[in-house]
Amino acid sequence: MLEDTSKSEVIGRIIHMDTEITASKPLKIDTTFNTRDLGGYKTKDGKTTKMRAFLRSDLPAQITDYSKKVLLDYGVRCVVDLRSLAEVNSMPNPLRSIPEIDYYLLPMLDQTTSQGFNGKMPDNMGTVYIDLLNNSQINFGKMFHIFAQHKDTTNLFNCTAGKDRTGVTAMLLLNLAGVDSETILVDYEVTESNMHTVFEKQKVMIKEKYGIDVPDSVFSSERFQMEMAIDYLERKWGDAEKYLLDAAVSEEDIRIVKSMLVD
């Protein structure tokens, strides 16, 4: 159940299993529905993740000049786009044309056209997230190096819906910050309600364009899907820090990103 009891533009609240957990609320930016700050989350040692360090987002397609200014005023100077080349060629990211912003493309899985699906849709996205952790580890490592190089700015990372590739990235960042898994799962779950209208339109578009009947699980953000990724991360690597070290991210870069997340 979603209950917004905050006057903040950024932080809302989610009640999950009778436990109140703060969850980021979308910024008021036109044409995006899931641009959210990773700040404001409690860590296991009692700290709070910093605001204006990281924004997770869906694609800001057709964004207006006013909302570009909103993002610049928010501090965004680095954008990491996780979409495939096919997606980028089909719909370029308008933020790449802003002179003040450093734009990076780190292609990861395209859930609608990628050969990684072998011509079929997955039963659930949890298996896709595990695949991302295994097969996109190098690009995840590159992304955290980019973040470390932009330590004094707000870093925005996006895919198309801001759910899957962006969700795994957010999971790694929050895990690195020391945020507990329950809070990470709540942050993930919010996407489905934020993007519901968009997802319904995408289902129709994919059917018409590719002739694919997309299962509901592809558009859902049920907690068990990200839980699968967290469980796999912990079993194989232990935590996000060990995962990033295995991805050839330097200890110094990890230290910097941690300092961006928490004091």
Question: Predicted regions span which residues?
Answer:
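Ser/Thr-glycine-rich phosphate-binding loops at phosphate-binding pockets of nucleotides
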Residues: A161, R165-T166
